Amino acid sequence: MLAVLPVLFGFFVMGFCDIVGISSDYAREAFGWSHTMAGFVPSMDFIWFLFFSIPVGIKMNAWGRKNTVMLSMAVTLVGMLIPLLKTDWACLVGYALLGIGNTILQVSLNPLLNNVVTDQKLLTSSLTAGQVVKAVSSFCGPFIMLFAVNVLGGGDKDNWYLAFPVLGAITLVSALWLYFTPIPHEKREDSGVTMGKVWGLLSDRTILLLFLGIFFVVGIDVATNFISSKVMIARLEWDTSTAGVSPQVKFI
């Protein structure tokens, strides 16, 4: 059962995508972005679910679940290093890679949990535990950003990007822990699933309604995480550091 620990820790890395909310406030000030440009940041992070989730899910049968999770960690780690170039385009590329890595991770991490939880009665509670770990990660995001600015950056808000190597170091620890943990391999086989067959499921009215429900709930979740700090800045005249804690009310 110890093999479940590095898999659950992977959910902590999964929560890093929620840092786009507070980090976009700092990026807007550092690069002189307009509010419209800053509003584009969540798209750079989450739009990749549309393009990569189904293809990765299909390819995962051939690659293997653990290998797919390791790929997601590698992409995420690269995305955490690129913002150190301290340019606006590097920041956007970093957000994009963070989104791609997170997409691959969300597709592959839940199935990998099946490989380490042998008792199917415990699978549901294990998945719930993973979401709790992800929520803790999202809750810690603003604190990590404040640590980067106030401790690593000497209180200079222009050093907000130092949060990324901190997150990158955590990602590296997670990847190494998982890599060196023996995990039983699932049987790999060609499932015969295609993009057309997957999209064809939406012809079922029940599946379509469930899909739309998830789509709108996730949209509200991302929008709340992103816009809450902006509302506090605009309406209550909070500074960026103080407003950054507002999304935590949702995650707590």
Feature map (PLM): residue ranges:
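Helix-loop-helix hairpin linking two adjacent transmembrane segments in secondary transporters
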Residues: 126-182
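Juxtamembrane intracellular "pre-TM" segments in multi-pass secondary transporters
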Residues: 185-210
